[in-house]
Amino acid sequence: MSKEYFGTDGIRGRVGEGPITPEFMLKLGWAAGRVFRQEGRRNRVLIGKDTRISGYIFESALESGLAAAGVDVAMLGPMPTPAIAYLTRTFRACAGIVISASHNPFNDNGVKFFSAEGTKLPDSTEEQIEHFIRQPMEIVPSSQLGKAARFEDAKGRYIEFCKSTVPFHMSFAGMRVVLDCAQGATYQVAPSVFKELGAKVETIGVTPDGLNINHEIGSTHPDQLAAKVVEAGADLGIAFDGDGDRVVMVDHKGEIVDGDEILYIIARDKMRKGRLKGGVVGTLMTNFGAELAFGELGIPFERANVGDRYVMEALLRNDWCLGGEGSGHIVCLDRTTTGDGIISSLQVLAALSDLGITLHEAKKGMSKLPQHMINVRVSQKVDIKGHTTIQSAVANAEKQFAGKGRVLLRSSGTEPVIRVMAEGEDEAKVRSIVAELAKIVEGSV
């Protein structure tokens, strides 16, 4: 059954436009409550959010809907998305809800759900929720209405959990770190974690006003952090996105260290310690340089479709524990159940501390290959794999790389374009091949 509202990462859109309205959120809360309240038991659902001004409206609406279905609600306030996943498990809640649009601007918002195990809901549960969204709303008898409360110690619990992912004997004393919290959900938690582990911390992006989340700051805009790291003479910088499930880093020279490089550093350290279970999962967009670097280490590598949901599916299918995306979604299943920017960055700092090296030195084992991409607009959906002219051109381009590069054509899931991308050792050659392929695609669709 196809879903009307749920996408690959929950429900998301522009505030005030369906389905991101108070009316829909009320119904969504009720529908979810009907699904979560099984066998008449009074289950509890956690609600967290990022710092968007609209989060307060939707928090109230979801709370009302859940209570109307007879479900108790615990509201945690602004908290990173992965914190909700963790706390859902430790509080023994039946589900967790996050109100966030991740790295998007303040005028977008959305909702994502976590199961009792702290993982994303299966399709079958999302389909059940959509079924009840289409039904008339019926409130349980007054004696069965859910109760709502705010939990004040949630931040402290999550801070202690983050710290527990670093060896007990390890301290980051003497390490100078700049944190960019993107005016988002990590603005209180992240500084506390790194300070309590001994690091000297400077911060930017820790004064959210409900409107400035992700605005020219955070993991999608690391330039401000890079400048601050160099200016402060810091050892490194760490940038999160608005809801804290992504991380990008900056070395002491101001050079960006993206998700592919972070994934490589963590994988190499786990392998060195004998703790890497199986191989590593990347995506179709993971830089070819990462694939080559993993190969040199003898680490199996597999590509999944773009999106942390697909990375997770590949990890579970292979029974592996580490995967991620260039955008900074890093999943360490031996530490947590979802992408976690704070915990991923802690694994990097622990590796640096253990080896006594800088972030700049740690990333040297992987050389990113030049990458170029052109978006070709199309008027209708195109079967790329079944198009003989396009596939012939792709095969010819791959021959030119002779195993030292790759070509990728894929349709966007959000806009009417075909993304034509190539990577290789020679940047001029890469650009030439992409330009030629883009022309062929334009002339064939």
From Swiss-Prot:
Binds 1 Mg(2+) ion per subunit. Its cofactor is Mg(2+). Mg(2+) binds at residues 102, 241, 243, 245. GO terms for biological process: carbohydrate metabolic process; peptidoglycan biosynthetic process; UDP-N-acetylglucosamine biosynthetic process. It comes from the Bacteria. The modification Phosphoserine is found at residue 102. Coiled coil: none annotated. It is an enzyme of class 5 (isomerase). This is Phosphoglucosamine mutase. The active site is at 102 (phosphoserine intermediate). Belongs to the phosphohexose mutase family.
